[in-house]
């Protein structure tokens, strides 16, 4: 039987450097879409990912949709 809520959900990760500098001359905001397991990671997800706008690895945090 299927449960009411799915365990794995899709989340969006956004670059923290690009989000903070959005008012300045930034070309855009880097975003990644990934999945997380609700049981194993109930808190917000934070990962180091490559940002093409910052040209380096930065912290990407989970955002609300």
Curated annotation (Swiss-Prot):
Q: Which GO terms describe its cellular component?
A: chloroplast; ribonucleoprotein complex; ribosome
Keyword entries, A-Z: Chloroplast, Plastid, Ribonucleoprotein, Ribosomal protein
Q: Which GO terms describe its biological process?
A: translation
Recall the GO molecular function terms of this protein's record.
structural constituent of ribosome
Q: Where in the cell is it found?
A: Plastid, Chloroplast
InterPro entries, per database record: Ribosomal_bL33 (IPR001705), Ribosomal_bL33_CS (IPR018264), Ribosomal_bL33_sf (IPR038584), Ribosomal_zn-bd (IPR011332)
Q: What is the annotated signal peptide range for this record?
A: none
Q: Name one Pfam family in it.
A: Ribosomal_L33
Per the similarity annotation, which family is this? Belongs to the bacterial ribosomal protein bL33 family.
Protein name, UniProt field: Large ribosomal subunit protein bL33c
State which gene encodes it: rpl33
